[in-house]
Curated annotation (Swiss-Prot):
NCBIfam families: PRK14414.1. It holds the Pfam family G3P_acyltransf. It is a multi-pass membrane protein. InterPro entries: G3P_acylTferase_PlsY. Catalyzes the transfer of an acyl group from acyl-phosphate (acyl-PO(4)) to glycerol-3-phosphate (G3P) to form lysophosphatidic acid (LPA). This enzyme utilizes acyl-phosphate as fatty acyl donor, but not acyl-CoA or acyl-ACP. Its main location: membrane. It catalyses: an acyl phosphate + sn-glycerol 3-phosphate = a 1-acyl-sn-glycero-3-phosphate + phosphate. Belongs to the PlsY family. This is Glycerol-3-phosphate acyltransferase 2. Its EC number is 2.3.1.275. The gene is plsY2.
Length: 210
């Protein structure tokens, strides 16, 4: 088959893998709710944890992480090189954030980004988990904790002597969910008042943080 056609197939497959609306389905199946209307209204696993249940949250987290890794694995299975695999990873994030099934209103791409970076640099997983747990224990703020923990993958890419392309790609993957979360961070800050931003970050009800 023509190589261009294979690339197109890989990219389309990656988008549809990413667009699987696991948080939405979990809300509907396990509690009969639209996850986009409760809690933080985010189509993410943390919102499922707090408003649907622990095990549905675990399931959604696993699916969303798996989407990023699966998109790259499928491209690899189709015989595509690392460059195309990286493009497929970005398509998976695009699918997660803008799913065609939900009028292009999805999540922030955090868990999917974790799956991508874990597939690319599995040696970074223990460091990421350690960073997340430490920050979560200190701040009790999931968004801040895993947002900062993302930076550990960039450090792994750099110290692990990965090529510059992989380092820059890791930076791009990390920045996407961080940028997506900026409006949410501003919302929390505005609700608490400019003088109480710190209190909003460290004391705000957990159900509204993601």
């Amino acid at each position: 088959m023509n190589s261009l056609i294979m690339v197109i197939i890989a990219l389309i497959a990656a988008y549809f893998i990413g667009s699987t609306p696991a948080p939405y389905l979990a809300g509907r199946i396990f509690k009969g709710i639209d996850i986009r209307t409760v809690g933080s209204k985010n189509m993410g696993s943390m919102n499922v944890f707090y408003n649907v249940g622990f095990w549905p949250g675990i399931l959604v987290l696993a699916v969303d992480i798996g989407k990023g890794a699966l998109a790259m694995a499928v491209a690899n299975w189709l015989g595509e090189g690392l460059g195309i695999q990286m493009l497929c990873a970005l398509m998976a994030i695009a699918g997660h954030n803008y799913p065609v099934w939900l009028k292009f209103k999805g999540g922030k791409g955090g868990a999917t980004a974790i799956g991508i970076l874990a597939y690319l640099m599995p040696e970074g997983i223990p460091i990421y988990i350690a960073c997340f747990l430490v920050l979560m224990a200190i701040t009790r703020f999931p968004t801040l904790s895993y947002g900062i923990s993302f930076l550990s993958f960039i450090l792994v890419a750099w110290l692990g002597q990965h090529d510059l392309g992989k380092v820059l790609f890791s930076l791009l993957v990390v920045m996407i969910p961080i940028i997506m979360y900026i409006p949410r961070m501003k919302e929390i800050k505005n609700k608490a008042g400019s003088g109480n931003a710190k209190r909003a970050i460290f004391r705000k009800n957990l159900k509204e943080r993601l």
